[in-house]
Amino acid sequence: MILRCDKMDRLFNLSQLHKNASSEDLKQGSFGIEWEGLRVRENGELSLSPHPEIFGNKLSNPYITTDFSESQIEIITPTFDTIDEAFSFFSFMSDLVNSSLDDDEFLWFQSLPCILPDSSEIPIAKYKGRELAEESMEYRKGLAKKYGLRKQLISGIHFNFSFKEELLEKLYENLDISEIESDEDSRISYKEFKNMLYLKISRNYIRYVWLIIYLTGCSVAAHDTFTPECTKLMEHSDNRGGVYSERGPSFRNASCGYKNLVHLYPSYHSVEEFTRDVQSFIDEGHLSQAKELYTQIRLKPKDPSDVLSSLRNDGIQYLEVRTLDINPFYKCGLIKKDMDFLHLFLIYTLIAEESDYENWQEEALYNEEMAAEAAYDFNMKLLKDGEEISLEEWGLRILDEIDDMCRTLGIGSRSLIDSMRQRIADPSLTYGKGLIRLIKEEGYINSQIKLSKINKITSKYLLENTDLLDDDRFKEYVPIALQGAKK
């Protein structure tokens, strides 16, 4: 069943959510974090050593593995019922990883890479021991050939989210079909209902992702060994091999970021249309497989080995938000209040009214890239249904609506929303502007290595001088995460 936007708004809106969901229902969910980051040497060069033995087999370690490169660590949390639990686990696991690296090796707390060697020397992640290993390596070789090795080293944070099944079941049971259908005998299945809910979130997230990019963006600089496609967009040199821009907060999300070679716009009106479109992209040679579709938010299936069939048969299980830059100003590269806001933002995308503007995806991509590359330009304008609007005006309007939603539903905090308002009213309070000030003073590589050292010292101190390793929340995970440790 496919519903028009106006009917979807009648199905998912603030009144319906307030009537059928408690604040506790909405505060809980299934939350997970995936964090990618490079290993670097003290001089700011990419570490070319193999994945540390202490973490064991990449394919069997569920929490610490590699992403594209052998030099690119990925931390993966299990799912938790609250953001507090997910963030605490992730922060601990980050401490564990950072403290386990050799003394002359550090995590690079930037989404854009460090000093890179010749492309031929960048090590693709090596896998062995399972049938999946060869397939994983071949897939990565294909990406390297298609997009270039340097671009593969762009790193970021993924936030996995779904509502609790109990809440979804409650919303489904209280569904008033007369709101959307004249045929009283018709009935949407539970799977269809979930799909509709997550698809509406996805559509609105894509429409408004520019706001998340502005509020959390922190990739304003690169080293000149990175791809010229990106460095040419950065108008300043730090005279130490680094380049940076004062125009926008997130070149990871900019036009030069990690994106498909051509713009691909699958339908988000139904799972059937989405999977049909993605399959056509594969058939036409734009994608090698479904997971090569790079979007700001992904529909995640029950069976990741057969994405399209599982989405059709099992429905959408959860959403993966892929927008967040690594933040160097906190020891694990992520700040919890940004996660709290992102959670509220996702709830907002469910209840926000939708527009029937035909070219909404093209417009959303324009806004995404303009916010990423030029949000600090006072004259920059976004597009809303074809009409120009300032980022400040639109952003504050959205935050007012989120504030109203939070008051009605009894979630969130006024101080959290106010802090986001302040970032819009005063760009100097954004992470990107803070990073620009640091780079002007110390240079890109020097400033980021200094932060990497501080973060490593902080992580080691916490593990050595607190009870974290014996904390009941974490201690059962340590031998699994450090499965390669010598006994």
Label every model-predicted segment.
Residues 414-487:
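Extended, compositionally biased alpha-helical segments that mediate assembly or anchoring
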Residues 130-137, 315-323:
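Active-site-adjacent bridging/hinge elements
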Residues 113-114, 222-229, 362-372, 418-426:
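A glycine-rich phosphate-binding loop feature that marks nucleotide/adenosyl-phosphate handling sites
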Residues 18-20, 133-149, 153, 162-313, ...:
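Loop-rich catalytic cores of soluble enzymes, especially ATP-dependent carboxylate-amine ligases
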Residues 312-313, 319-406:
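Substrate-recognition/cap regions that form aromatic- and gly/pro-loop-enriched pockets
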Residues 2-131, 135-144, 151-155, 200:
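Terminal catalytic/cofactor-binding subdomain
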Residues 36, 149-164, 318-325:
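Histidine-centered divalent-metal-coordination microenvironment in nucleic-acid enzymes
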Residues 48-51, 87, 120-121, 171-172, ...:
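Short conserved micro-motifs at the rims of enzyme active sites and ligand-binding pockets
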